[in-house]
Amino acid sequence: MLQYQPDHTVLRDKIILVTGAGDGIGKEAALTYARYGATLILLGRTLSKLEDVQNEIITSGGQQPMLYPLDLLTASENDYQEFADTIVKRFPHLDGVL
């Protein structure tokens, strides 16, 4: 059986938005993407959880991610527009969304 081992820089120069990044699958995805060199936007409901993930990423040598606390279930149209505007100002594009 073959086991694929991607190069540790396979996601370098890739910008990925991770929803639910404060815990669970979102957190694990964010940590994995960071390990492979991605620039991350961490979206989640709880700022303290996002900060914990950010600290893990930085401690392990990853790039500092952008944090954006927002509850998608209760967000208003204006909240979504503000989030989109923030991303457009800080990043030229997105390569992936989880």
Segments (PLM) and residue ranges:
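Aromatic pocket-lining residues of Rossmann-like dinucleotide-binding sites
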Residues: Y33
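Conserved glycine-rich cofactor-binding loop
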Residues: G22-G24
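Conserved N-terminal Rossmann-fold NAD(P)-binding element of oxidoreductases
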Residues: I16-G20, L43
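Flexible N-terminal pre-Rossmann segment of NAD(P)-dependent oxidoreductases
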Residues: M1-L17
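Conserved Rossmann-fold cofactor-binding substructure of NAD(P)-dependent oxidoreductases
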Residues: L73-R90
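A glycine-rich helix->loop->beta "capping" turn
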Residues: G61-Q64, T86-V97
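Rossmann-fold cofactor-recognition segment
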Residues: S60-S76
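Conserved glycine-rich Rossmann-like NAD(P)H-binding loop of the short-chain dehydrogenase/reductase
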Residues: A38-D52
